């Protein structure tokens, strides 16, 4: 067991990234355009370009006069992120990008193409302060929160990649298409960067020209169980999918595997999840990384099924995740027979349960592997 790291909820104070158009809601966009002395209709033009046409370079916004392009480029469209490394696997169907921000901070996103959907896994923080010992991100500590624009730029870049992608050596499923799903399951605890994440979600789900127009049902916000923030998220009425990273049904083990459990116990996290389900009518996803001889015992499967059925009834689904290897970890995934028995026992308690498809393990792009190295 690695030496436990402290929980960190408040990101270290660092200089803020430069203001970007994507940081601004409709009211702030109108104010920013007015500050530049431009007519009000330019705000909608810019939003249509960014959210509707996925254009972040004003020089490509040919419906704007050249002088206006120069003006907004300097004031509203600074270069925020640089892709410093891109790695692919699965014949191009899984692609990990290492991003570097203007202050040198690094973080990662992962684009995954499936036959029926295209999903981008995005980061909400550089690093993570939740200190889960089986997660490479958590063991790296928290550098800082990402800005709303830094979050949204990951989404826009993925949408552009899908729209423009083609070429030899690329599987047919990896060619072209439209971004359909967003999961806040990259680096960081989304609910610890609450205001910026919520602002990003609002822009993701709003129809163009105010946002990317992704269905709220296709957006998943993950959390290790910040119970008050889960309730707050429910009250936003955004109706996104909530994914609770549980990983153990009992406090004794979860106190170690998910250190935030020392603040909010399993019962408190499940009560908050039930509140979310009641308010939104949405089924809650439970994430459970299955670790050999740690949390895969039959009695824990029974307890998990019992507690989830009691707390959430039919409004729950368990995603069992075979543990992905991380550097220096002494743990590994449960054997397949143990995995199958675990799933069977959870289902026996009346709870929907499946094993999640693991993508990107070979390029350290799978759940728990993102470390922004290099």
Curated annotation (Swiss-Prot):
Sequence intervals crossing the membrane: none
Residues at the active site: 108 (proton acceptor), 367 (s-methylcysteine intermediate)
Keyword Glycosyltransferase: no
Catalytic activity field: adenosine(2503) in 23S rRNA + 2 reduced [2Fe-2S]-[ferredoxin] + 2 S-adenosyl-L-methionine = 2-methyladenosine(2503) in 23S rRNA + 5'-deoxyadenosine + L-methionine + 2 oxidized [2Fe-2S]-[ferredoxin] + S-adenosyl-L-homocysteine; adenosine(37) in tRNA + 2 reduced [2Fe-2S]-[ferredoxin] + 2 S-adenosyl-L-methionine = 2-methyladenosine(37) in tRNA + 5'-deoxyadenosine + L-methionine + 2 oxidized [2Fe-2S]-[ferredoxin] + S-adenosyl-L-homocysteine
Cofactor note: Binds 1 [4Fe-4S] cluster. The cluster is coordinated with 3 cysteines and an exchangeable S-adenosyl-L-methionine.
Cofactor or coenzyme needed: [4Fe-4S] cluster
Location of the protein in the cell: Cytoplasm
GO cellular component: cytoplasm
Main location: cytoplasm
Recorded GO MF terms: 4 iron, 4 sulfur cluster binding; metal ion binding; rRNA (adenine(2503)-C2-)-methyltransferase activity; rRNA binding; tRNA (adenine(37)-C2)-methyltransferase activity; tRNA binding
One GO BP: tRNA methylation
Pfam families associated with the record: Radical_SAM (PF04055)
Cysteines paired by S-S bonds: 121-367
Keywords: 4Fe-4S, Cytoplasm, Disulfide bond, Iron, Iron-sulfur, Metal-binding, Methyltransferase, rRNA processing, S-adenosyl-L-methionine, Transferase, tRNA processing
Ranges where the Radical SAM core domain occurs: 114-361
CDD domains: Radical_SAM
Residues noted as binding [4Fe-4S] cluster in the record, renumbered to the chain: 128, 132, 135
NCBIfam families xref list: rRNA_mod_RlmN
Note: Reaction proceeds by a ping-pong mechanism involving intermediate methylation of a conserved cysteine residue.
Functional summary from the UniProt entry: Specifically methylates position 2 of adenine 2503 in 23S rRNA and position 2 of adenine 37 in tRNAs.
Family assignment from sequence similarity: Belongs to the radical SAM superfamily. RlmN family.
Protein name: Probable dual-specificity RNA methyltransferase RlmN
Biological source species: Mycobacterium sp. (strain KMS)
């Amino acid at each position: 067991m690695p030496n436990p790291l402290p929980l960190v909820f408040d990101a270290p104070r660092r200089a803020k990234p430069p203001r970007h158009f994507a940081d601004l809601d409709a009211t702030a966009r109108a104010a920013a355009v007015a500050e530049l002395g431009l007519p009000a209709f330019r705000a909608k033009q810019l939003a249509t370009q960014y959210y509707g046409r996925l254009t972040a370079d004003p020089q490509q916004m040919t419906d704007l006069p050249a002088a206006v392009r120069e003006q907004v480029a300097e004031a509203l469209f600074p270069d925020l992120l640089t892709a410093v490394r891109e790695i692919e696997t699965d014949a191009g169907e899984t692609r990990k990008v290492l991003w570097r921000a203007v202050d040198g901070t690094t973080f990662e996103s992962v684009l995954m193409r499936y036959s029926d959907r295209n999903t981008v896994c995005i980061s909400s923080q550089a690093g993570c302060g939740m200190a889960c010992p089986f997660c490479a991100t958590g063991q790296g500590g928290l550098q800082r929160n990402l800005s709303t624009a830094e979050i949204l730029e990951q989404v826009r870049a993925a949408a552009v990649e899908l729209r423009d992608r083609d070429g030899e050596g690329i599987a047919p499923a990896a060619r072209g298409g439209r971004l359909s799903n967003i999961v806040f399951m990259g680096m960081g605890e989304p609910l610890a960067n609450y205001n910026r994440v919520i602002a990003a979600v609002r822009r993701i789900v709003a129809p163009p020209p105010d946002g990317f127009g992704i269905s709220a049902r296709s957006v998943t916000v993950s959390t290790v169980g910040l119970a008050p923030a889960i309730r707050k998220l429910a009250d936003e009425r955004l109706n996104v999918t909530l994914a609770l990273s549980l990983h153990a049904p009992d406090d004794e083990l979860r106190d170690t595997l998910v250190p935030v459990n020392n603040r909010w116990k399993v019962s408190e996290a499940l009560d908050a999840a039930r509140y979310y389900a009641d308010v939104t009518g949405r089924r809650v996803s439970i994430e459970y990384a299955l670790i050999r001889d740690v949390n895969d015992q039959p009695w824990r499967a029974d307890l998990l099924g019992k507690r989830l059925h009691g707390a959430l009834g039919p409004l729950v689904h368990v995603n069992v995740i075979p543990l992905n290897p991380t550097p220096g970890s002494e743990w590994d995934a449960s054997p397949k027979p143990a995995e199958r028995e675990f799933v069977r026992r959870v289902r026996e308690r009346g709870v929907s349960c499946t094993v999640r498809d693991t993508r990107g393990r070979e390029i350290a792009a799978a759940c728990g592997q993102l470390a922004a190295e290099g």
